[in-house]
């Protein structure tokens, strides 16, 4: 998983590692996810393209970074009155 933040960056930078650990645990180790911080494989703002092109299998970032690729991503990037994190997770499922 490539991310848009440095590894261990407080808050959002540690979330990717927590997600990876949760998936590893939930799959009993069948799925092993290694987290790469911004710049380790691709620059921060190239995470979306890296996943789309197959350079990385997963990406973790803020959808607002990629509004130019799809304006609909703005709805998931923090618009006031938009979905809460819980609502967004429920919608995605």
Predicted features and spans:
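Extracytoplasmic "Venus flytrap"
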Residues: 1-17, 38-42
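Acidic helix-start/capping segments at beta-turn-to-alpha-helix junctions
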Residues: 36-50, 74
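Short, polar/charged alpha-helical segment
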Residues: 9-32
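Glycine-/proline-rich flexible loop or hinge segments
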Residues: 3-4, 30-34, 74-77, 84
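Contiguous mixed-secondary-structure segments that line small-molecule binding/active-site clefts
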Residues: 17-24, 52, 57, 62-93
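A broad, structure-centric signal for solvent-exposed, well-ordered loop/edge residues
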Residues: 8, 42-43, 48, 83-86, ...
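Structural recognition of the beta-strand scaffold that forms the well-ordered cores
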Residues: 1, 33-35, 57-61
């Amino acid at each position: 998983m490539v991310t848009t933040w440095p590894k261990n960056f407080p808050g959002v930078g540690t979330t990717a590692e927590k997600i990876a650990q949760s998936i590893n645990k939930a799959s009993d180790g069948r799925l092993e996810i290694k987290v790469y911080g911004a710049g380790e494989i691709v620059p921060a703002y190239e995470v979306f393209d890296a996943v789309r092109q197959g350079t990385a299998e997963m990406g973790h970032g803020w959808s607002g970074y990629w509004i130019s690729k799809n304006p609909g991503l703005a709805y998931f990037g923090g618009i006031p009155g938009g979905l809460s994190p819980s609502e967004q997770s429920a919608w995605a499922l």
